[in-house]
Amino acid sequence: MLKVIEYDGNLKEIAQKLNNRKEEISIEVNNAVNDIINDIRKNGNQALINYCRKFDGYQIKDENDFVVSNQEKEEALKQVDQDYIRILERTKQQITEFHKNQIDKSWSLYKDNGVIMGQMVRPIERVALYVPGGTAAYPSTVLMNAIPAKLAGVKDLVIITPVKADGKVNPVIVAAAKVSGVDTIYKFGGAQGVAAIANGTETIEKVDKIVGPGNIFVATAKKLSYGVVDIDMVAGPSEVLVIADENANPKYIAADLMSQAEHDKLASAMLVTTSKELAEKVNVELKRQMAYLSRKEIIEESLQNYGGAILVKDLKEAFEVSNYLAPEHLEVLVEKPVNTLPYIKNAGSIFLGEYSPEPLGDYMSGTNHVLPTGGTAKFYSALGVYDFVKYSSYSYYPKDVLETFKDDVQTFAKSEGLDAHANSIAVRFEEE
């Protein structure tokens, strides 16, 4: 179970181990994805059709089969239970309530001398949301990405998702798209899907940004497409860090640690506590609860390789550990947890108290579950409305005000060897 480690002020080894969990992008994968991107750029629709047939087994006839038709949507929605639709709608309300507070506004500054300056906030025009295919469906991914984009004002939001050989998109993905207000769903994914939507083809309009999770080929395609389009982030394996005092409930802690460990064998679940007795009780609970969970083997390997219980002398040290590791998810199970917020510097998303478990955040708390991993919470943020807008500054200067700056600007420009810059100012004050 969790290996108990006494904190001695040195976390470099632990941090390095956690941050190295990302799958290395091998030369082979990189080259393969590069070839796919170049093929799509050169051969467009036909290359995409070939890859759909090769990788997904979807015997697509022509480019008309790229998009989920209205009839296909109607048939898919009939397969989704109405109570599930209710849950999606409730989740949408929660996400909207939180994220609407992130909406930024344009502003202007009018000075007495006639100068006008300001900043315009404008939505990104066209965005693609990648939704993983396969046996598992992730409608929460649709909601978490689409709703902030819609609140930002993105008018053209599309989904790309791989399909099986039958060419069908999972019905719950169709339902989530409808609830989120996404009308266009493309039936392709993988590196080829990213390449097609990033570069465009004869019938597919290129986007300005791609968001959403995917496998190593999707992640590589997104990285290689950055600059042609914007991307959200390239996330690594999931992680949770729980800070707990001696009064925390070991049953809850064990359950929350396993909720992350079940994602995959590279997931990390760490406990930081002031109580060795609590750590021991958590290990007992892990064994007990794990016995009846379907992903027991994955959980066990994850906890063994990337789990641990770090013993600290006080909560000050606990937050020192947490801020250094900068976890994707941080749970704080101590007395008066809300009062600890000033001590938290680096965390993707924070869950305060015993009744705010991380899985609530995965689905329905309203906060976003697209989060920085691998220590990148030190400089990255959770996905939000701000990821779907751009900022343009503007300025208006009357001639008489420019004249008060002309000598200084020319001197500055010449000091950098940019005579044409200086000339641009000078010509405006030459006598005709």
Model regions: which residues?
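Conserved NAD(P)+-binding/catalytic subdomain of aldehyde/semialdehyde dehydrogenases
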Residues: 181-252, 256-259, 263-268
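C-terminal core of ALDH-fold dehydrogenases
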Residues: 324-432
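Conserved small-residue-rich beta-alpha loop and adjacent elements
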Residues: 109-175
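Short loop-to-beta-strand entry elements in the cores of soluble alpha/beta enzymes
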Residues: 213, 233-244, 260-283, 299-310, ...
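Short acidic-hydrophobic, aromatic-tinged amphipathic segments that line or gate anion-handling sites
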Residues: 2-9, 184-189, 309-314
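Short internal beta-strands
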Residues: 155-164, 269-275, 353
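N-terminal Rossmann-like NAD(P)+-binding subdomain of aldehyde/semialdehyde dehydrogenases
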Residues: 1-125
